[in-house]
Amino acid sequence: MKPTDLYSNLIADGQLSFDKEQKSLLDKLDKLNGALIKRSKSWFKRKSIKGLYIRGEVGRGKTQMMDIFFETLDLKKKKRIHFHRFMKLLHEDLDQLSGQKDPLKIAADNISKDTEVLCFD
């Protein structure tokens, strides 16, 4: 199921009201979803895929649209985390890696072992 499909279902069920800006964002998230799924099934070297930075006024549904994207993304190695929590964990890792050569690269490699897609809120 694509993000726009879930969005349409939520509207049909009366859980959401249609918003053209949200729909426009979800169209972009559909494309990202498709590219990520295609990449995950590729036998060839995986190319990086440019993500999306979602911004807007408070109360416009940014978090909800990201949640819809995350829920519909059919990947096992995905993570959704609040930005401040992520930074706290990263700094804890960097403290533990203190004294090692290139601790930031080691921390990033550790994160990427378990994560193909990272959604920040």
Predicted regions located by residue number:
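Pre-Walker A (Motif I) flank of P-loop NTPase domains
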Residues: 45-54, 116
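Walker A (P-loop) phosphate-binding loop of P-loop NTPases
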Residues: 59
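Conserved lysine of the Walker
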Residues: 62
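Hydrophobic positions on the alpha1 helix immediately C-terminal to the Walker A/P-loop
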Residues: 65, 69, 82
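Post-Walker A helix-loop "phosphate-sensing" segment adjacent to the P-loop in P-loop NTPases
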Residues: 70-79
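Short glycine-rich substrate-engagement loop in P-loop NTPases that contacts/grips substrate
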Residues: 78-115
